[in-house]
Amino acid sequence: MEFKIMSTTDKIEQKVIEMVAEKLNKDKSIITTDSRFIEDLKADSLDTVELMMAIEVEYGIDIPDDEATKIKTVSDVIKYIKERQS
């Protein structure tokens, strides 16, 4: 039996992709770390606000509006979370 040990980054990536898929009603298989919320996943401004709020709750962090506007991709979210957790 093989066990895969997931790094913190892998766990964050997996959870963020799950959250994006749920909030944007997309299949997880089409979401990558390079996926852009608006251009690739067809999110609107309300979708992105709701996603940022869900991330804040899930990870116990605050994403000020000026920072939220800089978050364009899944990897941007992962990077932001990791910076706040370290």
Curated annotation (Swiss-Prot):
* Entry-linked Pfam families: PP-binding
Keywords carried by this UniProt record: Cytoplasm, Fatty acid biosynthesis, Fatty acid metabolism, Lipid biosynthesis, Lipid metabolism, Phosphopantetheine, Phosphoprotein
Instruction: Name all Carrier domain ranges.
Output: 10-85
Pathway(s): Lipid metabolism; fatty acid biosynthesis
| SUPFAM superfamilies reported for this sequence | ACP-like
Q: How is it modified after translation?
A: 4'-phosphopantetheine is transferred from CoA to a specific serine of apo-ACP by AcpS. This modification is essential for activity because fatty acids are bound in thioester linkage to the sulfhydryl of the prosthetic group.
A single BP term in Gene Ontology: lipid A biosynthetic process
What are the annotated GO cellular component locations? cytosol; membrane
Q: InterPro entries in the record, alphabetically?
A: ACP (IPR003231), ACP-like_sf (IPR036736), PP-bd_ACP (IPR009081)
Note the superkingdom of the native organism.
Bacteria
One example of the protein's molecular function in GO is: acyl carrier activity
Give the primary localization class.
Answer: cytoplasm
Sites bearing O-(pantetheine 4'-phosphoryl)serine, chain numbering: 45
Q: Where in the cell is it found?
A: Cytoplasm
Which family would the database say this protein is a member of? Answer: Belongs to the acyl carrier protein (ACP) family.
The protein's job, in short, is: Carrier of the growing fatty acid chain in fatty acid biosynthesis.
Question: Record's HAMAP family?
Answer: Acyl_carrier
Its protein name is Acyl carrier protein
